[in-house]
Amino acid sequence: MNVNAAYGWLPTVRALRKRFYPDVVQRDPVAAFVRRLEQFVKPTDDLLDLGAGTGQLNTHALKGRVHRLVGVDVDPRVGTNPLLDAGIRADIGMLPFRDCSFDVVFSIYVLEHVDRPGELVAEIGRVLRPGGVCLMLTPNILHYVTLCSRLTPTPVHKWINAKRGRPAEDTFPAVYRLNSRRALSDQFNDAGLERVSIDLIEVQPNYLTFSSLSYVLGVGYERLVNATELLSPFRVNLIAVFRKPETASTIARTPR
């Protein structure tokens, strides 16, 4: 993905990005998540991408490196997602798969849109094989971007994302019910899944590219919260990993 085109960056901001983040891939949250995901993936694994979308926004190169990569999304365009072996239109809260179908389940910027987290987490546990893992990238509820998002309506989010080069149809309402360490741990533990790790990361200020001043302030914030673990609770993204115990029985579908 062309970062400048994707975010509609001003030339002055582009120059600042090159100055402060010369290795842009290393400072990209999706790239950081994919590196973490790859630590758990084997060539024989069956993977499920929750909220896979069109494959144009959050990219990875897992197809062809695993046994099978399936994606699910309510958007019918998932059927043409080039990153997948198969794209299926379905509600991620009611997955159309048999119990114990996947070795790895993952999601990229999806949890913040889930208004019934208990149903989703139960479904993840149901379709995971014993010993399988679930990895998720989602915004941290304590970050300034998320706090601002909660105070503004969805049309404002669409307008801001349009300025960043993101189509309006790819911006969805956010409810942030799984966007803290505690919320994630509570929901997944209740579903019988074990916490492996929950890390917080702060990356380049992609939401502050509308002016040079805002971008520089964002760089300062990034440097500050990355300077000490004491400020890690205020970093922008959560990367969470949970595992289904080897001895786990099938987790029943949550009643609707």
Predicted regions and their residues:
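A short SAM/SAH-binding and catalytic strip from SAM-dependent methyltransferases
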Residues: 106-115
